[in-house]
């Protein structure tokens, strides 16, 4: 991914598109995240949390309708749409391909951005994609039992933690995998609230 140039927007202002548009995160010159230079792509934590809130609302409505009315059409459709949305984020981040990510970015467009590392967010989106895809496959195959509901409730819990509390559980897991030397990214994760702070990997020193 190319590094930022003087033509890139200021990190002090929110913007709808990353540069280049098909990158998961944005690169900036002279940006620091939690006291260290951000030599890695970043995303706007506020937009991520807003998007998580939208997904949480959709998932909650779908599961409630399935549970109380025994109508599984909404959960079948929403699970497919959410899985597709998270898949698109793996390609181009929150914008412009992800409809929910774009909506989340739009909702916080007038707020000062809070930049965090994109790598661990991509890991979190991959986990959410896997869960949504599993729900989509099972519900569209006619499986609507307790197991599917538990997967859905777990996903809602993770989204609630992200959007309401501001704690990304998957990002924390990602940082623990680094600490256990199970994965070796070039940069240590920079999470919201500095909640997954660890020493920079040897490759980045």
Cite the ranges covered by each PLM segment.
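Membrane-interfacial helix-loop segments of redox and metal-homeostasis proteins
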Residues: 2-3, 8-205
């Amino acid at each position: 991914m190319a590094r930022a140039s003087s033509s890139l927007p200021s990190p002090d202002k929110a913007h709808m598109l990353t540069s280049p548009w098909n990158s998961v995160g944005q690169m900036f010159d002279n940006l620091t995240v939690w006291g260290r230079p951000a030599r890695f792509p970043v995303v706007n934590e506020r937009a991520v949390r807003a998007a998580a809130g939208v997904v949480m609302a959709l998932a909650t409505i779908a599961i409630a309708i399935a549970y109380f009315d025994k109508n599984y059409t909404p959960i079948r459709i929403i699970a497919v749409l959410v899985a597709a949305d998270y898949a698109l984020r793996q390609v181009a981040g929150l914008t412009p391909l992800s409809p929910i990510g774009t909506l989340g970015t739009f909702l916080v467009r007038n707020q000062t951005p809070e930049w965090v590392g994109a790598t661990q967010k991509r890991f979190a989106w991959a986990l959410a994609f896997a869960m949504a895809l599993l729900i989509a496959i099972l519900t569209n195959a006619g499986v609507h039992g307790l197991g599917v509901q538990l997967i859905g409730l777990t996903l809602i819990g993770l989204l609630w933690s992200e959007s309401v509390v501001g704690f990304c559980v998957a990002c924390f897991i990602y940082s623990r995998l680094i600490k256990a030397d199970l994965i070796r990214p070039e940069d240590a994760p920079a999470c919201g609230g500095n909640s997954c702070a660890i020493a920079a990997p040897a490759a980045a020193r």
